[in-house]
Structures are given as structure tokens and as C-alpha cells.
């Protein structure tokens, strides 16, 4: 498959124009409801919680400073992507990671009313894990539309891995096993395109399995009007306002073309 390079990111943009063979039309998706977006909106979409041999989120200080500025926040943490282990342990891991940056982490599972917690949140972070479990549990808690509303109104948002995936219009370009069945594939739609976290180009020597490009090519064959950005580990998208999007990451991670 020919990869389409655009001026947003050299990480990998797979353009729908590259797949033009005839096929049956894809089933029409249920579109997200239009929502007003504040010019103060700030969204950080991170590919991963680690970069090379880093500790948990300890490479991302500059990314969080870009998102939060000098202000210190109490951040509502969404741990619902966690499958093996406990929310308590996940919360502690994220608390320890954010402590050097001066932010306080409180997990949504501490609150009796998750909807109220979202309505009153000053900032929101969504952790990685299994995207299918994450989306299913957010729908069960009734917070998908609430988070979308709050972030579009200007509440800062960060999400890594699965938490970055759900910033897209849908979860359809996750790498995860579909262990749960959400009522809809629709997610937050903070950006108008899909991302693929932990993106690695090419296959593994000695293995004959399909590559990440193969999987994304299938997506684009079936969804001709879509675009996908592959985000290598360490890379993030920083979105401000409606759709002003910048690629950020460690100095040796992929940058803009």
C-alpha cells in the first residue's frame, strides 16, 4: 500500500486516496452529534505511557507542560481500560507518575456519582489498557457525552494509548482484542480522523503475520473516506481550539514533514 504523506506528521498518515479499488460500500456509521468547540479547548493525544526504556509517563513532562501550562490541576482519572489488576493500583501508578509534575490524580471510581465527577472536573485524564473495555465501561457509566461536552468547552484532556484512541471519532483503529462489546463504536471525536497508537512500521523478522500497515490498509479499503495517523511510541498530538493540531514528542521521535 502506498502511504500518503501530508504536512501534519512524518510518523505515518495513511490516506484514503491510496485505496481506490471497487468494493461493497461500508455500512453507514451513526455520526456524532455536532457540538460547539471552545477556542480554549486543549487535548493531548499520546501514543504510549512509555518511550524506549523510560519509566511510566516520565518522558512526557514537556507534553504535560504544553497542555496544562504552569497551572497545577486536580485531574479526574478514568481507569476503565484496566482489565488485569485493580483501579486502586492503577490510580496509584498514575498518581506517582504525575506527582513530579505537580498535579493531583483522583480516580473516578472514588466517586459515587461518576457523572457528577465529570461535570465538576477541572481536567480529565484517560489511561491506557484495553480500548474495548474502556469504551464499554464509559458507556455503562453514562459519561461519554459528558466528557466530550466538558472537553469541548475547554477542560484540559490527556489520554495515552487507549485513552488517546478514544479521542478519535471511533475506536475502530485500536490494536486491542475486542473483549467487550460497547453499544456503539463512537467515542469522543476531538479530532476528525483516526489514530493508531504504538505504531510500528514493517513486520517482525522471521514472522509471517500481517503488519500494522496491513491492518490499517484493510480499514482504509473498507472506509474509503477515512484517514488514519500512525503514532509511534513517544509521539503525541496536541490539539487546540477546533482542529489546530501539532505533533510533539521526544527529540528523536518522528516530527512534522
What are these model-predicted stretches?
Residues 35-70, 78, 85-92, 96, ...:
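C-terminal and late-domain segments of enzyme folds
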Residues 141-154:
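Catalytic-core regions built around general acid/base machinery
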Residues 125-128, 151-170:
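Catalytic nucleophile loop
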Residues 82-134, 139:
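Portal/gating segments that form or line small-molecule/metal binding sites
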Residues 1-15:
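N-terminal secretory signal peptides and thylakoid transit peptides that target proteins
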Residues 22-42:
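C-terminal segment of N-terminal export signals and the immediately downstream linker at the start
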Residues 16-22:
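Hydrophobic h-region of N-terminal signal peptides that target proteins for export
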